[in-house]
């Protein structure tokens, strides 16, 4: 038999036809002599009727003993369903297949968990048995949607003159940015390849080579901490263009995303993408990836706060910090004391030292400790600056610039969620431009490239590269959708003198720069066109368009938070022989074989938080998860401590018998038990009557 139809494709127009279906048994109902099977494939579900009068006895016996999720092939006639079995919820609900022949292609063993769509299954279990989880219609739909998004992007780029070119997966390690995944070389002992964090250098070399327009659906790998929107290996749609300026690329990107949206969502984006500079985005929204689905912009009141008598505000203003506020319009009567305390707790979690607030009732009555620190004129000026009206709730943060931005950005999103303002069906794109070229690293005590060392500064800022790096703006840009950064790009440095200055500003000696990027320095000597590019995360875009909660919902085989694969148990130890060939850690490998390390116990922080009734932010989940697993690891290490030769600990109370094995106690004597009873009848103790 050969499959003639998908299970989910049979319709009433096929009635009377002979069809062969293949799929997984999703449900079985034995009515005595007639067995109904729900058979599922990627297109949907078909009802198969196994009647002992129409099926060979052996085939009917198979139908009687089928386990759920067994794979079968069934041949029969498509017919109209009886009225009582009609199912309007299914596309195939009007028809069924009367089986004439049934073959079990693969018998399923009892399942590790329920495959019912409404079953509550732990994510760790679903990821361990990902091949079963992939049978869920929701996940299959997400992966097909992902394919459509990728095809739509490629369709646009192919039509716009781009050439798809693959770049190497085994690259040179350049320790700037995230950590590399390293691959040892067998042929060159002691040397390592790095798996690509992006095709950045290679696509620039393609521009030097005259390819003009390049794109690639590239696999990228970064050894960094995971979040809901981050995986160690991910897919990005990567592109680069020659002889372009920033404006050319921004216009190209807007057309690209509008085309993708039109093709896969069936909707037009009827607005031009707003553009904000990095500074403007930080000032108005507290972050460089603003969610524009709602307003509630941050207002700066530092100058006004500096004139009041509130010591916290004045001290922050005097020390060069910021005092900023968020007006939650119409929330005064909605926010209870508990709500305000919750927001205060969130503010503390974001690093603020507290949260001042003003509550203006609908009647005009004001609740706030702040009012007494302002003169009447100052107070009115403050309310006017904040557009404060009856019914508004205004919250304040006073601290260093970064702390204020982080806190008010987080609180803005918290309030947006409370008020239901972040509609998942509303898609708001924007560009963020003019990022700082450098950011200060407290850990390394030097300036680091905010994007990468190949980003072109603005021409007018070049004189400040060596004298005032914090002042230098880059020709870099991000595309943001609903508060999520989809991707980044920039105009690249194509002049050798500017690239040399950049390396010096980053603290590279000439020898270090040549050791890491010598081939690029040489390439720039032989004629390099002005060029720029962009890359966006395919996984992130799909996650946003589907309204998914995690990248794991749109990737076939994702990693978990510790970058492990629960299905294959990767990473894992390798044989000593493999390491010997690589001339790498031979003794360690031998020891690993003799004494395999125990896996450190871990516990999901979400589970602990739910049990403890805790409400944690994403940052708190990461921090507390690390602390919890550190404690578990410490407890495991304590269990492994050899206490054979450790002297017995001295105690205040006797401890002679604490390690004695338990033995049955001698039975109590009847007379002894009854001796303290006031009265007793036979073997029963008499007690006073308490209730009638």
Which residue ranges define each predicted feature?
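Class II aminoacyl-tRNA synthetase catalytic cores and aaRS-like
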Residues: 1-596
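Short amphipathic alpha-helical/adjacent loop interface patches that line ligand
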Residues: 23, 257, 609, 628, ...
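Long, charge-enriched, surface-exposed interaction segments in small proteins/subunits
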Residues: 596-601, 606, 614, 629-692
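Alpha-helical initiation/capping and key positions within long helical/coiled-coil segments
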Residues: 248, 623-627
């Amino acid at each position: 038999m050969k499959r003639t139809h998908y299970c989910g494709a049979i319709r009433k127009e096929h009635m009377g036809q002979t069809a062969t279906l293949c799929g997984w048994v999703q449900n079985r109902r034995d009515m005595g002599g007639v067995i109904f099977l729900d058979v599922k494939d990627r297109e949907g579900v078909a009802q198969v009727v196994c009647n002992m009068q129409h099926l060979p006895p052996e085939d009917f016996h198979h139908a009687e003993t089928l386990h759920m999720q067994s794979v079968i092939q069934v041949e029969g006639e498509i017919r109209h369903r009886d009225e009582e079995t009609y199912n309007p919820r299914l596309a195939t609900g009007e028809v069924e297949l009367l089986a004439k022949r049934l073959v079990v292609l693969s018998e399923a063993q009892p399942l590790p968990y329920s495959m019912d769509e409404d079953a509550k299954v732990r994510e760790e279990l679903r990821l361990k048995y990902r091949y079963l989880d992939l049978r869920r219609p929701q996940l299959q739909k997400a992966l097909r949607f992902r394919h459509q998004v990728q095809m739509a992007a490629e369709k646009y780029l192919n039509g716009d003159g781009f050439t798809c070119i693959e770049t190497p997966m085994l690259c040179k390690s350049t320790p700037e940015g995230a950590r590399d995944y390293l691959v040892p070389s067998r042929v060159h002992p002691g040397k390592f390849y790095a798996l690509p964090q992006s095709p950045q250098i290679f696509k620039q070399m393609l521009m030097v080579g005259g390819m003009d327009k390049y794109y690639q659906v590239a696999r990228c790998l970064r050894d960094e901490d995971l979040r809901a929107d981050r995986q160690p290996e991910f897919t990005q749609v990567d592109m680069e263009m020659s002889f372009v300026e920033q404006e050319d690329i921004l216009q190209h990107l807007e057309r690209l995303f509008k085309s993708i949206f039109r093709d896969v969502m069936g909707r037009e984006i009827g607005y031009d993408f707003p553009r904000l500079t990095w500074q403007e985005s930080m000032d108005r929204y507290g972050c460089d990836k603003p969610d524009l689905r709602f307003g509630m912009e941050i207002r700066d009141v530092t100058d006004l706060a500096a004139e009041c008598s509130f010591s916290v505000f004045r001290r922050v203003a005097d020390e060069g910090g910021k005092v900023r506020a968020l007006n939650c319009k119409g929330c005064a009567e909605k926010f209870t004391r508990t709500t305000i305390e919750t927001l205060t707790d969130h503010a503390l979690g974001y690093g603020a030292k507290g949260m001042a607030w003003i509550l203006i009732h609908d009647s005009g009555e004001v609740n706030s400790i702040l009012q007494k620190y302002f003169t009447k004129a100052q107070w009115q000026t403050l309310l006017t600056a904040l557009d404060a009206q009856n019914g508004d709730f205004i919250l304040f943060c006073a601290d260093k610039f970064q702390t204020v931005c982080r806190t008010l950005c987080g609180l803005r999103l918290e309030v947006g969620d409370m008020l239901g303002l972040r509609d998942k069906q509303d898609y708001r794109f924007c560009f963020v431009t003019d990022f700082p070229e450098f950011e200060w690293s407290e850990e390394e005590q030097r300036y680091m490239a905010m994007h990468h060392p190949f980003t072109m500064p603005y021409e007018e800022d070049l004189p400040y590269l060596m004298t005032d790096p914090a002042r230098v703006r880059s020709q870099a840009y991000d595309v943001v959708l609903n508060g999520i950064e989809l991707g980044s790009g920039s105009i690249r440095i194509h002049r050798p003198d500017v690239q040399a200055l950049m390396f010096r500003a980053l603290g590279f000696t000439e020898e270090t720069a040549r050791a890491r990027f010598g081939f690029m320095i040489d390439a720039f000597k032989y004629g390099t066109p002005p060029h720029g590019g962009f890359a966006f995360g395919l996984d992130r875009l799909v996650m946003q368009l589907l309204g998914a909660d995690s990248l794991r919902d749109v990737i076939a085989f994702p990693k978990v938070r510790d970058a492990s694969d629960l299905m294959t148990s990767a990473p894992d130890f390798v044989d000593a022989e493999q390491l010997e060939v690589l001339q790498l850690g031979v003794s360690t490998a031998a020891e690993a074989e003799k004494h395999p390390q125990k896996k450190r116990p871990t516990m999901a922080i979400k589970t602990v938080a739910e049990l403890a009734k805790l409400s944690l932010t994403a940052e708190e989940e990461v921090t507390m998860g690390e602390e919890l697993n550190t404690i578990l690891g410490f407890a495991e290490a304590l269990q492994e401590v050899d206490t054979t030769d450790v002297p017995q600990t001295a105690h205040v109370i006797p401890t002679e018998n604490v390690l004695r094995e338990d033995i049955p106690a001698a039975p109590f004597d009847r007379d002894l038990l009854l001796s303290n009873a006031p009265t007793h009848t036979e073997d029963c103790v008499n007690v006073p009557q308490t209730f009638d």
